[in-house]
C-alpha cells in the first residue's frame, strides 16, 4: 500500500461536505487564567478550506454549496469529524451543520 501525504489541497470533500480550518480557541480567561486543553470550549468558528461539489438531488442535478473557500463560518458545536493536519485543526462536516457565514 502506498503512503498518502495529506495536505489541505489533497483533501477533496464529497457531496455536500465542507472542510473547515478551526479558529484557535482561547488560551486564557478574561481574568488572565491559563486554560489547559481539557478545559477549553470546542470552537464553533472556522474558515472554509475546501468545498465539495454539492448535494446530489433526486433528479441527478447538484445543489451548489452556499459557502466558498475563504468564508468564515459558524457551525454546530458537535458536528462533523475532527481532523489534525500539520499542527492545525480541521473539521469535515455537512453543509447543513453550518449555521451562518460571519462577515
Curated annotation (Swiss-Prot):
One of its GO terms (molecular function) is protein folding chaperone. The keyword Plastid does not apply. SMART domains: Cpn10 (SM00883). One of its GO terms (biological process) is chaperone cofactor-dependent protein refolding. Keywords: Chaperone, Cytoplasm. It comes from the Bacteria. One of its GO terms (cellular component) is cytoplasm. It is found in: Cytoplasm. Its main location: cytoplasm. SUPFAM superfamilies: GroES-like. Heptamer of 7 subunits arranged in a ring. Interacts with the chaperonin GroEL. Together with the chaperonin GroEL, plays an essential role in assisting protein folding. The GroEL-GroES system forms a nano-cage that allows encapsulation of the non-native substrate proteins and provides a physical environment optimized to promote and accelerate protein folding. GroES binds to the apical surface of the GroEL ring, thereby capping the opening of the GroEL channel. Belongs to the GroES chaperonin family. PANTHER family: 10 KDA HEAT SHOCK PROTEIN (PTHR10772), CO-CHAPERONIN GROES (PTHR10772:SF58). This is Co-chaperonin GroES.
Amino acid at each position: 500500500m502506498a503512503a498518502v501525504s495529506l495536505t489541505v489541497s489533497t483533501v477533496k470533500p464529497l457531496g455536500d461536505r465542507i472542510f473547515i480550518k478551526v479558529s484557535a480557541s482561547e488560551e486564557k480567561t478574561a481574568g488572565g487564567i491559563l486554560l489547559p486543553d481539557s478545559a477549553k470550549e470546542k470552537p464553533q468558528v472556522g474558515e472554509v478550506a475546501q468545498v465539495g461539489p454539492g448535494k446530489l438531488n433526486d433528479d441527478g442535478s447538484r445543489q451548489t454549496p452556499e459557502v466558498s473557500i475563504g468564508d468564515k463560518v459558524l457551525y454546530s458545536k458537535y458536528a462533523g469529524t475532527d481532523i489534525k493536519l500539520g499542527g492545525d485543526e480541521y473539521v469535515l462536516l455537512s453543509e447543513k451543520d453550518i449555521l451562518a457565514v460571519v462577515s
